A protein has these predicted regions:
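Structured alpha/beta reader/binder surfaces that contact nucleic acids or chromatin modification marks
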Residues: 2-174
Length: 174
């Protein structure tokens, strides 16, 4: 089953199970138990107060080295440019799922540990920003998107995103 044929979560799960049978060498990206991220205290306080639900990081070499599963990426690259490319790139995801994010400053004088509900990457396009708006109520990229659209920029940046869940531990005070 491909993207155009899938309308429900059940259909996706069935298609994904078929995909895994067809490609037994495929392995899900290895999860990251705890991801350390440097953050300014004001943003950590916004998360603690429930005002900020999303965190973004540039799709840079630094974060790709930390967040991209090399084995899954190699599997996907094997099918790049083949007749199986669409199917493989639809089901396979090389972004390593993060379980907990440990936000802190450079000196580690404070920390904020939060559950990561979901992480992946987005492109600064109308569709991806609309997804963030509707799925998470996140409007942090709206102004940047409008600026790129006004300038008719074709090369759009990518970002890793993290949906922040419940606070697990912190030494910050409200």
């Amino acid at each position: 089953m491909l993207k155009d044929e899938i309308k429900t979560q059940e259909q996706f799960e069935k298609g994904f199970a078929e995909f895994k049978k067809k490609y037994p060498e495929y392995k899900d990206a290895k999860p990251i138990e705890r991801l350390n991220l440097i953050m300014r205290k004001e943003f950590a306080m916004q998360i603690l107060k429930g005002e900020k639900k999303m965190e973004f990081r540039a799709f840079s070499e630094h974060y790709c080295n930390r967040l991209v599963d090399k084995d899954t990426s190699n599997f996907m690259n094997k099918y790049f440019g083949t007749e199986h490319e669409d199917e493989v790139f639809f089901y396979a995801n090389y972004v390593r799922p993060v379980k907990v994010i440990h936000f802190h400053n450079y000196s580690n004088s404070w920390h904020l540990d939060v559950e990561c509900e979901r992480n992946d990457f987005v492109t600064l396009t109308d569709g991806d920003v609309k997804f963030l708006n509707e799925e998470y109520g996140c409007h942090e990229l709206d102004d940047m998107l409008n600026d790129f659209n006004k300038r008719k920029e074709e090369n759009r940046p990518l970002f890793f995103y993290f949906s922040c869940g419940k606070v697990i531990d912190t030494n910050l005070q409200l």
